[in-house]
């Protein structure tokens, strides 16, 4: 049975443009995988704890020395990493907030990036340890940034995902949403979704 991990990072939940496009992807995916399972992480509905010194210390404390609170921190990280490993594909809805990703998504990534678990350092540099799989990024922007120096978001996403071993990355952009181009941008994005699902 195929498994799709859906990550929605919009502050506005299903009302967010990136979430709407990610939901569209999921519905199309279901038609191709009627017996498939969709695992959802919606950061508008769940608390994603930002890393602090206490949490970092928990991740570096040997298992036999952890307190109950530290063990809970590690178990959260272990769980979301296991979800990624178990998925056959990932769809990620990402709005552009102040030229970057939502802070909740950054916090989620911080719990995933663990030396010896999702990446390791070697003499020739870091090596990602996650099993590669398709990652579909539905990027929703109010303005137009694709291909511009100001689009630091796309570069960051590629760099981070590559770092942990995820290299099969597919971007689908919906831009100009606050410039009177929403209908056209959504239609184009949905067409690209159809093409990706059919590929």
From Swiss-Prot:
Enzyme nomenclature, EC number: 1.6.5.-, 1.7.1.17
Record-linked Pfam families: Flavodoxin_2 (PF02525)
Chain residues that bind FMN: 10
Required co-factors: FMN
The family this protein is said to belong to: Belongs to the azoreductase type 1 family.
Molecular function GO labels: electron transfer activity; FMN binding; oxidoreductase activity, acting on NAD(P)H as acceptor; oxidoreductase activity, acting on NAD(P)H, quinone or similar compound as acceptor
Swiss-Prot/TrEMBL catalytic activity: 2 a quinone + NADH + H(+) = 2 a 1,4-benzosemiquinone + NAD(+); N,N-dimethyl-1,4-phenylenediamine + anthranilate + 2 NAD(+) = 2-(4-dimethylaminophenyl)diazenylbenzoate + 2 NADH + 2 H(+)
Cofactor note (record): Binds 1 FMN per subunit.
Name of the coding gene: azoR
Native source organism of the sequence: Cellvibrio japonicus (strain Ueda107) (Pseudomonas fluorescens subsp. cellulosa)
Keywords: Flavoprotein, FMN, NAD, Oxidoreductase
Gene3D superfamilies according to UniProt: 3.40.50.360
Subunit structure: Homodimer.
Transmembrane regions: none
Protein name: FMN-dependent NADH:quinone oxidoreductase
Functional description taken from the UniProt entry: Quinone reductase that provides resistance to thiol-specific stress caused by electrophilic quinones.
């Amino acid at each position: 049975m195929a498994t799709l991990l859906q990550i929605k990072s919009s502050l506005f939940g299903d009302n967010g443009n990136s979430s709407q496009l990610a939901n569209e992807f999921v519905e199309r995916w279901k038609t191709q995988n009627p017996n498939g399972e969709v695992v959802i992480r919606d950061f508008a509905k769940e608390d994603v704890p930002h890393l602090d010194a206490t949490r970092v210390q928990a991740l570096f404390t040997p298992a036999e020395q952890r307190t109950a609170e530290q063990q809970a921190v590690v178990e959260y990280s272990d769980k979301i990493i296991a979800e990624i490993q178990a998925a056959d594909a990932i769809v990620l809805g990402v709005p552009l907030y102040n030229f970057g990703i939502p802070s909740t998504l950054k916090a989620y990534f911080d719990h995933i990036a663990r030396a010896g678990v999702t990446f390791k350092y070697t003499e020739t540099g870091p090596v990602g340890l996650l099993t590669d799989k398709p990652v579909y990024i539905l990027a929703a922007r109010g303005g137009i940034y694709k291909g511009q120096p100001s689009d630091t978001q796309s570069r960051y996403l590629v760099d981070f995902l590559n770092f942990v071993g995820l290299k099969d990355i597919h971007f689908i952009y919906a831009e100009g949403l606050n410039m009177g181009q929403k209908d056209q941008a959504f239609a184009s994005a949905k067409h690209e979704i159809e093409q990706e699902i059919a590929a």
